[in-house]
Curated annotation (Swiss-Prot):
It is an enzyme of class 3 (hydrolase). The lineage of its organism: Bacteria, Bacillati, Actinomycetota, Actinomycetes, Mycobacteriales. This is Exodeoxyribonuclease 7 large subunit. It is found in: Cytoplasm. GO terms for cellular component: cytoplasm; exodeoxyribonuclease VII complex. Its main location: cytoplasm. GO terms for molecular function: exodeoxyribonuclease VII activity; nucleic acid binding. Keywords: Cytoplasm, Exonuclease, Hydrolase, Nuclease.
Length: 411
């Protein structure tokens, strides 16, 4: 069975008063007891007896108000400043009077360099497993960028080095500079914001992230997971020029190009106008030399061809062949005439033989050819010419017609 107190706060007709809610929240929080918390100092204000700090979680971009006795800060194992990574022991508190939440700490420990490096290594393995370091994902750096996006500290040596070296190499180079904090708890949000702004600018062809050297703590923002993932998501090529040669923050592995120093970044992003001009001049010189050598070789080859007898007197071979043609034509004509004479004589002989062996010669010797009419069949027997048969008798000088009177028995 529920009581009116159990139903309080569950309907607009029976609301809780503020004091009741605040008291309940304070009781819930008080049950947490003492807890160890790790974070990064973003603010530190010291009053007469109390120190006020803000602890930030870089991975989640959340913060928590912290208070402690002033002596606790003064006796901390390391000097405390904005950006210091610490582990604190404290008791969460909820102040019912103003509804604020805070952490009252009683112990401060610094996160050692070894632990920081171990965490960076764990994050490195995680990002590597996700493929963020894959060389196949690296975007090519343009040969001559129209505008270079530069993210760096205001009036820093890194900014001066990049811009000075780039201008000396290519005087017409253009920059879109975004000055940000490059260390401490606020560095990551500012750098990420600058990256997004430059990546959205269609006129920016490459982005350079530049910072001078520093301690492991100083370079922590450049191994931040949020920043690394933002670099990986950029569509514009990103060059990491953070620290000096020995430094190796995680952004170096995610970026499309890692430069050892800001000066090295300027050299690798901007071509050297003098060197390019010298290269073009050398190309022109080598091209001209190659062309001259080719012309010389071809001229020498042509001279060799022209020195050959056939080219020195090109008509000589034609004349020699013409004489051969004339001789061949004359020989062909002689052969044709001889063949015509021989064949004419042969035809004469054949004609004479034909005349001798032909029927005309037989008729000339007194013989006759008798044919029955009108079928002109040659008469071979007397039976073929009974009485009354019309006959045609062919003799040497013509033909005679006759009529058979019958047969006469041969004796």
């Amino acid at each position: 069975m529920t009581t009116p107190a159990d139903d309080q706060g569950k309907s607009p007709e029976n609301p809780w008063p503020v004091r009741a809610v605040a008291t309940r929240v304070a009781k819930y929080i008080d049950r947490l007891g003492m807890v160890w918390i790790e974070g990064q100092l973003t603010e530190l204000k010291i009053r007469q007896t109390t120190a006020w700090m803000v602890l930030r979680d870089p991975a989640a971009d959340m913060s928590l108000s912290v208070s402690c006795p002033r002596d606790l800060v003064a006796n901390a194992p390391v000097p405390l400043s904005e950006g210091t990574q610490v582990i604190v022991l404290g008791k969460p508190q909820f102040y019912t009077r103003n509804g604020s939440f805070s952490l009252r700490i009683s112990e401060i420990r610094a996160v050692g360099i070894g632990e920081l490096l171990a965490r960076i290594d764990r994050l490195r393995r995680l990002l590597d497993a996700e493929g963020l370091f894959d060389p196949r994902l690296k975007r090519p750096i343009p040969f001559l960028p129209g505008t270079i996006g530069l993210i760096t500290g205001r009036a820093s040596h890194a900014e001066r080095d990049v811009m000075t070296v780039a201008a000396n190499r290519w005087p017409a180079v253009r920059f879109a500079v975004r000055n940000t904090i490059v260390q401490g708890p606020n560095a990551v949000p500012q750098i990420v914001g600058a990256l997004r702004e430059l990546d959205r600018d269609p006129g920016v062809d490459v982005i350079v992230l530049a910072r001078g050297g520093g301690s492991v703590e100083d370079l922590l923002p450049f191994s931040d997971e949020t920043l690394c993932r933002e670099i990986a998501s950029c569509t514009t090529p990103v060059v990491s020029a953070v620290g000096h040669e020995p430094d190796n923050p995680l952004c170096d592995l995610v970026a499309d190009l890692r430069a050892a120093t800001p000066t090295d970044a300027a050299k690798r992003v901007v071509p050297d106008a003098a060197a390019e001009q010298a290269f073009v001049t050398d190309l022109r010189r080598r091209s001209a030399r190659a062309l001259r050598q080719w012309v010389h070789r071809e001229q020498h080859h042509l001279d060799q061809l022209r020195s050959r007898p056939v080219l020195a007197r090109p008509l000589q071979a034609i004349d020699a062949r013409a004489d051969e043609v004339h001789r061949a034509v004359a020989a062909a004509r002689r052969d044709v005439r001889r063949m015509v004479t021989v064949e004419s004589e042969r035809v004469g002989h054949l004609s004479a033989r034909l005349t001798t062996l032909g029927p005309a010669a037989t008729l000339a010797r007194g013989y006759a050819v008798v044919q029955t009419m009108p079928d002109t069949n040659v008469l071979r027997t007397t039976a073929d010419a009974p009485a009354g048969t019309h006959l045609r008798i062919r003799v040497a000088d013509g033909a005679i017609t006759a009529v058979s009177e019958g047969t006469d028995e041969a004796h």
